[in-house]
């Protein structure tokens, strides 16, 4: 949902010319194409899946907080922040999706992934509506970026809970998938 509004954010808050404003948010998908397989391989080799999710979630919250408070309204800073967001967008799924298979029994894994995608698609359909309405009464993007920051904080809390639960139940979220 963030990418839907990111181009206008670049124009409004970072003084990016309209004809170039789409390039900066476009760094995110390009970066995730390169980084997600790299982080997935890292998780396979060193483990620390819940920690990687925690780091990515913290980066996500920090980036949206920075966007909410409008510090350094220059294009090059927006590029740095957007690249950081791309790293976060790569870290979380590269650790999250393989972790599902460690927690959910194989006989219900398909159902678990179905439910995850169901919930994700609810968010992908409703959050843009919410953000669009919020941007209507607050065109500065402070409120909308604060909402995304709150999602990041929720993800931080869930990541910490995963670390705690993994220590108790020994799912192996922090263990490498490739054993030496």
Where are these regions (language model features)?
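A membrane-interface helix-boundary motif in multi-pass transporters
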Residues: 133-152
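Helix-to-loop junctions at the C-terminal end of transmembrane segments
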Residues: 35-48
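Intrinsic disorder in cytosolic terminal tails and internal cytosolic loops
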Residues: 164-180
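A late C-terminal transmembrane helix in Major Facilitator Superfamily
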Residues: 103-138
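Interfacial helix-cap and linker-helix signal at transmembrane-aqueous boundaries
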Residues: 10-11, 42-44, 131-139
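Extracytoplasmic gate region of multi-pass secondary transporters
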Residues: 1-33, 93, 97, 127-128
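C-terminal transmembrane helical hairpin of 12-TM major facilitator-type secondary transporters
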Residues: 49-96
């Amino acid at each position: 949902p963030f990418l839907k509004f990111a181009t206008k954010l670049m124009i409004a808050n970072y003084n990016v010319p309209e004809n170039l404003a789409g390039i900066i948010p476009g760094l995110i998908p390009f970066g995730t194409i390169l980084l997600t397989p790299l982080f997935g391989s890292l998780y396979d080799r060193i483990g620390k899946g819940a920690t990687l999710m925690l780091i990515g979630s913290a980066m996500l919250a920090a980036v949206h907080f920075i966007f909410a408070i409008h510090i350094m309204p220059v294009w090059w800073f927006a590029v740095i922040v957007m690249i950081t967001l791309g790293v976060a967008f790569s870290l979380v799924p590269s650790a999250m999706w393989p972790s599902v298979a460690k927690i959910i029994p194989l006989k219900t894994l398909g159902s678990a992934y179905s439910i995850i995608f169901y919930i994700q698609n609810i968010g992908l359909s409703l959050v843009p509506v919410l953000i669009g309405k919020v941007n209507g009464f607050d065109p500065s993007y402070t409120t909308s970026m604060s909402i995304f920051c709150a999602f990041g904080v929720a993800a931080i809390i869930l990541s910490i809970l995963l670390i705690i639960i993994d220590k108790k139940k020994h799912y192996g979220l922090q263990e490498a998938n490739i054993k030496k």
